[in-house]
Amino acid sequence: MGAQSKYAQQLNNERSLAPFIPFRSQVGPTTVITRDGDFVRTWRIAGLAFETQDKEKLLIRKDQLNTLFRAIASNNVALWSHNVRRRTWDHLKSFFSNPFCDALDKKYYGSFSGYRMMSNELYLTVIYRPVPAKISRLFNVAVHRSHAEILQEQKLAIRKLDEIGNQIETSLRRYGGDDGRGIEVLSTYEDKHGALCSQQLEFYNFLLSGEWQKVRVPSCPLDEYLGTGWVYAGTETIEIRTASATRYARGIDFKDYANHTEPGILNGLMYSDYEYVITQSFSFMTKRDGKEFLTRQKQRLQNTEDGSASQIMEMDIAIDQLGRGDFVMGEYHYSLLVFAEDMETVRHNTSHAMNILQDNGFLATVIATATDAAFYAQLPCNWRYRPRVAGLTSLNFAGLSCFHNFRAGKRDGNPWGQALTLLKTPSGQPAYLNFHYSKGDEDNFDKKLLGNTRIIGQSGAGKTVLMNFCLAQAQKYLHNAPMGMCNVFFDKDQGAKGTILAIGGKYLAIRNGEPTGFNPFQMEPTAGNILFLEKLVQVLVSRDGQHVTTTDESRISHAIRTVMRMRPELRRLSTVLQNVTEGSDRQDRENSVAKRLAKWCFDDGTGKRGTFWWVLDCPQDQIDFNTHSNYGFDGTDFLDNADVRTPISMYLLHRMELAIDGRRFIYWMDEAWKWVDDEAFSEFANNKQLTIRKQNGLGVFATQMPSSLLNSKVASALVQQVATEIYLPNPKADYHEYTDGFKVTNEEFDIIRSMSEESRMFLVKQGHHSMICRLELNGFDDELAILSGSSDNNELLDQVIAEVGDDPSVWLPVFQERRKARIASSKSTGR
């Protein structure tokens, strides 16, 4: 006799689990057989990222799911699906040599303490039930059959299950990332001790105990082996005790269903802050049984006069659709088990879950009869314990069990190792942010993949803080980098100044009329550098539209090569001028290279300074990527100065090009459109967007003016050649700029426009998938004073560094002390 559920037991009435476990043995790497001879296989499904998906696409996926159900429909087949929401915890491990980055990282991950980090895991189980005659021969009179015959019957059943499994895997492989790895069968594996373990049994054991643990494949029957807890069933509450914890559960099922089951109708539960398990089963009916069921439903409506004319007409339509094969019918059951650590909390969580279900049109009720039966019905094949079995169409089932989930990004196996950082999300799902976009579970470490990133956000949305936070987090990639790492930040309005200096970098604010600290002639006298210097000087002497003749080129080359043979401290543009020969006639002398070059020199040959001496003729060059791995250059002033913009850009880009030598490299551009407006930067960005990945580098581009970026000279490269797109809130976002220019979907655009500017949320997109993330830095006042790059804090920073030096360990405490004193004084004055 099979185990019978006892109703209305007292909470402390222990029940033995064995009679309620239908499984007998593991008969293959992915297959379990039950006592009744059913063959069972389970898959883990990554899930369709619904949160930012267009509704039309979700409907298409629902129809495709219905098509799959129709394809595998047979009264020999049944499905169990599970949505498991449980608490999780994660912390990316990083090593920082810089104290500011290390302290920021520790404080940031410390802020996750008490945060409800949750994960949603989706599972689909397929049960293949051999025909009754074969079941009878196999299991009731097996004694009369040979062992070989029994194995042959089993082999045929597994082959049929394989066929069904192939259809499922083909249809659901896109329920994940772009790599087609949205579904993974639960299989056996060997642990480090060589013992054979089973993911499938681990999942079934979790359903019984609420705990994930390694489960070895036993030699004894599974019903005697699984279940590492004790279950006590009360009228409405179940107590589950294990060696490590005691938990309480309450069940919810449906007394009546919503009028329509659009895909994701149950998704509201996936934002809750408590653990639960949703179990749904669907046992396919034959077409005849399905038609009989619908006909009985129609007759009931007619006989009881409960149904309106429209409802009866809907039943007629459903019968016609069933006949056409638009869907199939099945026996369906739903249960939601909500968990908590105490009775009061589980009651509160249950009430919250019921409100969500009822808001979506379901008549939900707490399971008060056969409470334990609903618990055991979580296990696939426990048909006898299913509460409130109903007839349902496969189309409805596709809406209720639609395998929606949240995108999480990629934690490990990225080109530079672990993800850049961990972010919070509205659902509590951990989100892993990366520059590079790499597929699925592949280990792409050290592979040269595209990593260019674009950040779009209006003023006040948090763009500067996000960029600087990412810059600080990226310092971890210096650790264990065989050739080192380098960051070059092309800044605007000195937004990154505090961060660059705090992480031990060097920051040069290029102001019109003030020495830049640039001296290109102190570079190593390599052939490549000399050729660059010749080109640079040619640009200097042709800025006013002057033509550079072949003779001019020869004179420039001779002067530069002469100077580059001198000691470094003697090499500068003024020395080049001294070595440029004059023309042989008056006309040549009037428009000579020397006269044109003089305005760029500290000494123009008459003891006077040239107009632009401050640009490239400084006594000591301040750029050295061997002493600093992080450089910041502020272009606020010089980018609007057409006279000096191109020469400065050429030198900066040449020095950066020299640093792109195989080491990990990131170049950052704030208000990128402004930088690429110059021809030198435009050419560089256009080429590097395509090639920098091969050199182990990437670019990060940001702007608060999408139209300017889209209208830039290299818009196509900045739009198309990116791996990661980040969109901060923008209530004033222009539809055509975002959808036509950046190719975001309508749903993504609506999210970008509807997110609150104070929410610190943003949308991250890679490939065709996106997720909503949040960088939460509440309580980070000291750190935000550095990361935000405000002008008043930059002024204070300059004062402090001028007094105590540029060692961050020295100036940071002084800066914070004075900043707080300034705020306190301001508050006092305000009173």
From Swiss-Prot:
Lineage: Bacteria, Pseudomonadati, Pseudomonadota, Alphaproteobacteria, Hyphomicrobiales
A Gene Ontology molecular function term of the record: ATP binding
Entry binding sites for ATP: 457-464
Keywords assigned by UniProt, alphabetized: ATP-binding, Nucleotide-binding, Virulence
Similarity remark: Belongs to the TrbE/VirB4 family.
PANTHER family found in the cross-reference section: TYPE IV SECRETION SYSTEM PROTEIN CAGE, UNCHARACTERIZED PROTEIN YJGR-RELATED
Record-given protein name: Type IV secretion system protein virB4
